[in-house]
Regions:
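Acidic, serine/threonine- and glycine-rich low-complexity intrinsically disordered segments
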Residues: 155, 164-287
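Blade-loop segments of beta-propeller domains
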Residues: 67-131
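Bacterial Sec-dependent N-terminal signal peptides
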Residues: 1-41
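Short coil/turn segments that connect the beta-strands within blades of beta-propeller domains
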Residues: 36-40, 86-88, 134-136, 174-178, ...
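Conserved beta-strand positions in repeat-built beta-propeller and related beta-rich domains
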Residues: 42-50, 91-95, 138-143, 180-189, ...
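Intrinsically disordered, low-complexity segments enriched in Gly and acidic/Ser/Thr residues
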Residues: 256-348, 354
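A short beta-strand motif characteristic of beta-propeller blades
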Residues: 22, 63-74, 108-121, 155-160, ...
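Repeated scaffold domains used in trafficking and secretory/extracellular systems
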Residues: 76-84, 121-132, 164-173, 211-222, ...
Length: 387
């Protein structure tokens, strides 16, 4: 597998921020600004039809967690994804057709906008995933569209018609063109695809491969794509063909077998960003045991990940995974097991643990979340240190 260099300004910005912490030759103890991860936020789906979606923030410094329902109003019914831009967390509320704006420091609701009012009833219903690029936000809707949202005016400036039931999205491209890649899940009906949007011209084309039937998340390195696909279900609801696929020029190769969620972190060699480490877990419907894997896009190697040291807070029903973009530490969220039934309880608050990149539980990092933790993100801040 070719070892492609990153060629997007977004990737290089991340590389420069990280390497500035590593390659400091200052010997006079002059205070320097460095970027650190200050915490993690978790979007909790809440209980179906109870309107109790919430946000949990885990503060690294105090190792304490706060879960908020935004003054009682909550994040609606089934918040599904979130993206941090500046000091605002933009949360997509799938059932409510909303994008909620939350202040990342006070965890209070700033504002909200209706995606159906912005885009139309049929185009804007059920927003699913959101990302940011060049100070704009991009979100998918089950109406089959991607909306481009101006965070200052809260208006949709462009909308792009993509495939059926779009989910995750990611930016990639070449030295001359920036593309937005979109997972079209087809709602699990088996005719999934990837849409490629040229951000300069607005043109859209479709990438299809028979192996990729139900794409959910996507990671891009240039035009190399790594797609988390949920495959399909047989008549007994066994999940078949789920995994992580490498897609290039229309081909698709499974690099991780059996995976239901994933997150990534940039790999650095000699201070240069060279690829991703993609960490996955597999816990399909009906499972009793989760498995974890790591795939290195630079070497093309897959390895297993074994969690350890967490016997007091064992992850038994994983629901989300996030990888700290600076340290590579891993946060895994879990549903709580009902002691009477022995099964995951979808009505109780969940919890999360932090692990080193090698899978060792980090003492003091167990914390409670809201009901059904679903999406994990991280907050980065600049701080002044002396060397």
């Amino acid at each position: 597998m070719k070892k492609y260099l990153f060629n997007l300004a977004l990737m290089m910005m991340g590389a420069s921020l990280f390497t500035s912490c590593l390659n400091n030759d200052n010997n006079d103890n002059t205070p320097q600004k460095v970027t650190v991860t200050s915490g993690a936020f978790i979007i909790n789906n809440g209980q179906w039809n109870k309107n109790n979606g919430s946000l949990t923030f885990f503060d690294y410094k105090s190792t304490s967690a706060t879960t908020t329902l935004m003054g009682g109003s909550g994040l609606g019914d089934t918040p599904n994804d979130a993206c941090l831009l500046g000091d605002t967390i933009f949360v997509v509320g799938s059932t409510d057709n909303m994008i909620f704006l939350v202040n990342r420091k006070s965890l209070s609701m700033i504002d909200y906008v209706s995606t159906t009012e912005l885009m139309g009833e049929s185009e804007g219903y059920s927003p699913r995933a959101i990302t940011a690029f060049n100070n704009k936000l991009y979100f998918t809707t089950y109406g089959g569209y991607v909306g481009e949202l101006n965070p200052k005016t809260l208006q949709v400036e462009r909308k792009f018609k993509v495939g059926s039931a779009p989910e995750g999205l990611a930016f990639g491209g070449t030295s001359s063109e920036v593309y937005l890649f979109v997972c079209n899940s087809d709602y699990g009906n088996g005719d999934g695809s990837i849409s490629r949007i040229n951000m300069t011209t607005g043109s859209i084309d479709e990438i299809k491969n028979d192996k990729v039937k139900n794409p959910q998340k996507i990671f891009a390195i240039g035009t190399d794509l790594y797609v988390l696909d949920w495959g399909h279900y047989d008549e007994m609801w066994n999940q078949i063909g789920a995994g992580l696929y490498y897609m290039y020029n229309g081909t698709a190769t499974q690099v991780v077998k059996d995976a239901t969620d994933a997150d990534n972190v940039v790999i650095y060699v000699n201070g240069q960003a060279v690829g991703y480490e993609i960490i996955t877990f597999n816990y399909p419907y009906g499972s009793t045991t989760a498995t974890y894997s790591k795939f290195n896009t630079y070497t093309g190697q897959t390895s297993s990940l074994v969690l350890s040291g967490d016997s007091n807070y064992k992850i038994e029903s994983p629901s989300a995974i996030g990888v700290d973009p600076l340290s590579g530490n891993i946060i895994i969220a879990s549903r709580t097991i009902n002691k009477e039934t022995g099964y995951a309880d979808y009505t109780m608050p969940g919890f999360a643990n932090m692990y080193t990149n090698s899978g060792q539980y980090i003492e003091g990092t167990h914390f409670q979340t809201g009901v059904e933790p679903h999406k994990i993100g991280f907050t980065l801040d600049q701080t002044v240190v002396s060397y």
